[in-house]
Amino acid sequence: MATANGTRRYLRIALIVIAAVEAVGALMGVPGIFYDFNPTTPLGKFAQWLTSADLVLAVPITLAALYFAVAGRLRYAIAAIAIRVLVTWLSDLPSFWIHGIEWSLSYGGITVAVYDIGAPLIALAAIYLAWRNERLGLATLLVALPTILTWLGVLAFAIGVMIHGF
């Protein structure tokens, strides 16, 4: 039983870190709610509305995830982070109609394809695992992947700037 408690503690710490990083990012995005890109088409206006809705929902969802993680309610924390991933993915859907499918064999194209296909799958899988109270470690890893991959991209960019200058 001590092993289960130890594993649970590590999952809780991981979820606290992921939820805190996401909450800080959500709070930093609040000014974007009020920015007007002056879209000229109805689809552009809808896309801006979805982005604003995503930014508005990000704060309570990530703060709820942080609360649940701190309170030790791991299933709810996993579900909240997964819902955040789904909401962000949904807000990106109009880009299919605005820009077309942007998948290609370049790094950017592969990244977009993996996100477009992978984000809803991992979020739904994590929600399912949390709902069933099974394999919470895997569910935690799944909801952490978008955050981890985002910060690895930032790190790679920073290293590139340090090596080659800006």
Region spans (language model):
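Cytosolic juxtamembrane helix and N-cap/initiation of the first transmembrane helix
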Residues: M1-G25, P42-T51, Y67-A82, N133-A144
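Membrane-water interface at the C-terminal end of transmembrane alpha helices
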Residues: R8-I13, A119-A139, L155-A158
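Aromatic-anchored segments of alpha-helical transmembrane domains
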Residues: V21-M28, I83-S95, L145-A156
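Short juxtamembrane and helix-loop transition motifs at transmembrane-helix boundaries
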Residues: Y35-Q48, R75-Y76, I101-G108
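Alpha-helical transmembrane segments of polytopic membrane proteins
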Residues: G44-T62, S106-L121
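Canonical alpha-helical transmembrane segments
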Residues: D54-A79, I122-Y128
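Short alpha-helical packing/oligomerization segments
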Residues: V87-I127
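Juxtamembrane boundary at the C-terminal end of a transmembrane helix
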Residues: L152-F166
